[in-house]
Amino acid sequence: MPARRATLAQPPARVELTFTERLEPAYSTVSVWNEAGTRVDLRDPALVAGNPRRLAVTLPPLPPGRYTVRFRVLSVDGHVVEADFPFTVTGPR
């Protein structure tokens, strides 16, 4: 959440990603960037309590605009996944 290429009327409070395997928290991260290339998340990526397959990061109130989620994770089976995807906020903070 949000979904890839989602258009949201309200900004999300956080980004939460779900993977098929358990993640190694020390080697897994997610961040959110604005159109100017500035990191906008609260720099607190962490596994979701009780679910080692979910990674989340908290967001401040975001103004309308296009954002990019970037992540790099290491699963316990040794696979590294690195990717990014955009989402757009159209509504108020």
PLM features per residue range, with description:
Residues 4, 9, 78-93:
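Extracytoplasmic/periplasmic copper-protein system
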Residues 1-6, 38-39:
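Transition segment at domain starts
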Residues 7-17:
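Contiguous beta-strand segments within globular domains
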